[in-house]
């Protein structure tokens, strides 16, 4: 018997898909800016401006990405328990550390089943803490590189100090390396989400579209709190058991 629980609120799902789209566009345009692999004929009227077009798309998408990060940060303090910033620091509680150990044992093939949680397991929460840090770092390095080429912009006074510590080429390399790390994470994220969905049968993959997951009745409380988090629960309709045949 399972119950339907509203886990991922609209801002969580919205920022998730905005981030996905932004990372795809930023990776494509960013790689081109660093290594122009599309040859444009000089006879085409837009040929001299093709790099400018790619850079323009990159910059606009970067601002959308930063806006999405800010919205998700705001919702980490306003949303439900599964959207909370506490989910990024599971190691601060005993329940979180226990859940993290369970998840790690599952991924190392020591345990047969993953931990049953409504939101992210504690190991995933720690991973997302690293991902948020990478989001901030790639945004900062990108704005610093932009400010270097546009010293009249607001970003040069805010980020120019970094070039007294590190040279531009090293900063650009860091920007590219973080991009590859995020791409690698995305591949692992899709695989692990599909795996856990198949193992638990809780609708994990569809939940990022609908917001709902399906949890077993009597499932243990999430590691985020030492009690069952208040949620919008919609019990599944129950089918009345068939009458037992009379014994002779």
Where do the PLM segments sit?
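Membrane-embedded alpha-helical bundles that constitute the cytochrome b-like, heme-associated redox core
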Residues: 1-248
């Amino acid at each position: 018997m399972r119950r339907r629980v509203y886990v991922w609120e609209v801002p969580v799902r919205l920022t998730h898909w905005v981030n996905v789209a932004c990372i795809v566009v930023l990776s494509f345009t960013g790689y081109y800016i660093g290594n122009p692999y599309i040859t444009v004929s000089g006879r085409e009227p837009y040929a001299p401006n093709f790099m400018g077009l790619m850079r323009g798309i990159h910059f606009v998408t970067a601002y959308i990405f930063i806006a999405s990060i800010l919205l998700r940060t705001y919702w980490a303090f306003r949303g439900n328990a599964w959207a909370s910033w506490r989910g990024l620091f599971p190691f601060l509680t005993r329940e979180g550390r226990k859940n993290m150990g369970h998840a790690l044992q599952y991924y190392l093939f020591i345990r047969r089943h993953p931990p049953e949680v409504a939101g992210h397991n504690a190991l995933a929460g720690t991973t997302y803490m690293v991902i948020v840090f990478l989001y901030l770092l790639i945004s900062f390095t990108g704005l610093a590189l932009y400010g270097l080429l546009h010293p009249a912009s607001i970003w040069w006074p805010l980020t120019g100090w970094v070039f007294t510590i590190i040279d531009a080429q090293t900063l650009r390399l860091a920007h590219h390396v973080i991009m590859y790390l995020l791409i690698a994470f995305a591949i692992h994220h899709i695989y692990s989400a599909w795996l856990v969905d198949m193992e638990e049968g809780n609708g994990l993959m569809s939940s990022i579209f609908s917001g709902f997951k399906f949890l077993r009745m009597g499932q243990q409380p999430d590691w985020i709190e030492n009690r069952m988090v208040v949620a919008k629960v919609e019990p599944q309709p129950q089918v009345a058991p068939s009458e037992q045949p009379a014994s002779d």
